[in-house]
Amino acid sequence: MTRNKYFILLSCLMVLSPSQGQEAEEDLPSARITCPEGSNAYSSYCYYFMEDHLSWAEADLFCQNMNSGYLVSVLSQAEGNFLASLIKESGTTAANVWIGLHDPKNNRRWHWSSGSLFLYKSWDTGYPNNSNRGYCVSVTSNSGYKKWRDNSCDAQLSFVCKFKA
């Protein structure tokens, strides 16, 4: 008889345990990223498209002054796809949009202004090239804003800022 009591007690505990944990899980608030108005969240960052046209250095400084960010670093294909969608959804007609990749020593060693490692690449066919002495990088509308081209850092382009949420 005692054996049956333990079996019944154990059975009840097994039935109640999963539902107890489930209720507690449902009570927890979900972690949501909040970004300032006009910016969009992706992963743990906020992204802000700026239609104004600035040089690469002016654009990066603008981003640093805005929520301690930088020109956008594109660290994966998924992030590149998000960036392309963000720019297209803005309705811009810009042919090129600055990103945070540059060659500060003009030696074809590319760096993200944020200090992120340069591991992912998405160069457009034939780029980077040496013909235009471009040491700053933009995404191009010809590729749906998914491919990169080097440009003169003095070119006046729209840009995207990236900052921690």
UniProtKB/Swiss-Prot annotation:
- What would be one Gene Ontology cellular-component term for the protein? zymogen granule
- Going by the entry's taxonomy, the superkingdom of the source organism is recorded as Eukaryota
Q: Which first-to-last residue range defines the signal peptide?
A: 1-21
What does the record give as the organism's lineage? Eukaryota, Metazoa, Chordata, Craniata, Vertebrata
Alphabetically list the UniProt keywords. Answer: Disulfide bond, Glycoprotein, Lectin, Pyrrolidone carboxylic acid, Secreted, Signal
What is the name of this protein? Answer: Lithostathine
Molecular function per GO: growth factor activity; identical protein binding; molecular function inhibitor activity; oligosaccharide binding; peptidoglycan binding; phosphatase binding; protein phosphatase binding; signaling receptor activity
Gene3D superfamilies xrefs: Mannose-Binding Protein A, subunit A
A Pfam family name for this chain? Lectin_C
The protein's organism comes out as Rattus norvegicus (Rat)
Gene (name only): Reg1
